[in-house]
């Protein structure tokens, strides 16, 4: 009977295992069937908005006040106001009419830091219109507020009473001076 050392058996058995561990995985298919797009690193091919820069305008900082949402647009017509109110009603928000008699824009009067008296808090016209489904009713409230205070800034806000946040705010009427 021939005796073989255990070291020789171990060496013989380990050699093929190490060779198998070193071979790369070749089970992936070739990507020859996929379409290939050629990358272009040339920066001159990037499109530019240079032609549109000439028609862009800057908001004039003197003589024009920015108020609320949409303040960069001309005053909204009654039809446009109706569509905005219909939008906030569709979202399920509660419409509310507010007015300001002096300054309808953010201003610092008593302190340099923001606070209660910086023009963001306006006087509420009556109560919020809970349960309102008709946009014309909201515009009727705006007209009544305007009749009572003709030289007031009037805005419409949309309040989400579930999240308890104001979601939209826009100017419905400004004094003739502005």
Swiss-Prot record:
Transmembrane segments: none annotated. It is found in: Plastid, Chloroplast. GO terms for molecular function: ribulose-bisphosphate carboxylase activity. The keyword Transit peptide applies. Residues 1-54 form a transit peptide. Keywords: Calvin cycle, Carbon dioxide fixation, Chloroplast, Photorespiration, Photosynthesis, Plastid, Transit peptide. GO terms for biological process: photorespiration; reductive pentose-phosphate cycle. GO terms for cellular component: chloroplast. It comes from the Eukaryota. The keyword Cytoplasm does not apply. The basic functional RuBisCO is composed of a large chain homodimer in a 'head-to-tail' conformation. In form I RuBisCO this homodimer is arranged in a barrel-like tetramer with the small subunits forming a tetrameric 'cap' on each end of the 'barrel'. Belongs to the RuBisCO small chain family. RuBisCO catalyzes two reactions: the carboxylation of D-ribulose 1,5-bisphosphate, the primary event in carbon dioxide fixation, as well as the oxidative fragmentation of the pentose substrate. Both reactions occur simultaneously and in competition at the same active site. Although the small subunit is not catalytic it is essential for maximal activity. Heterohexadecamer of 8 large and 8 small subunits. This is Ribulose bisphosphate carboxylase small subunit, chloroplastic. It comes from Trifolium repens.
């Amino acid at each position: 009977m021939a005796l073989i050392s255990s070291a020789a058996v171990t060496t013989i058995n380990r050699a093929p295992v190490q060779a198998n561990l070193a071979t790369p995985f070749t089970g992936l298919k070739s990507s020859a069937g996929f379409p290939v797009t050629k990358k272009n690193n040339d920066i001159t091919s990037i499109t530019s908005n240079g032609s549109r820069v000439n028609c862009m305008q800057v908001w004039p900082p003197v003589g024009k006040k920015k108020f609320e949402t949409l303040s960069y647009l001309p005053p909204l017509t009654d039809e446009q106001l109706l569509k905005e109110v219909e939008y906030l009603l569709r979202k399920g928000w509660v419409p509310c009419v507010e007015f300001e008699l002096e300054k309808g824009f953010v201003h610092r009067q008593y302190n340099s830091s923001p606070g209660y008296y910086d023009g963001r808090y306006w006087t509420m016209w009556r109560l919020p219109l809970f349960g309102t489904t008709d946009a014309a009713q909201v515009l009727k409230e705006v007209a009544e507020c305007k009749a009572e205070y003709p030289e007031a800034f009037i805005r419409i806000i949309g309040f989400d009473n579930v999240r308890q946040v104001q979601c939209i705010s826009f100017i419905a009427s400004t004094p003739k001076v502005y």
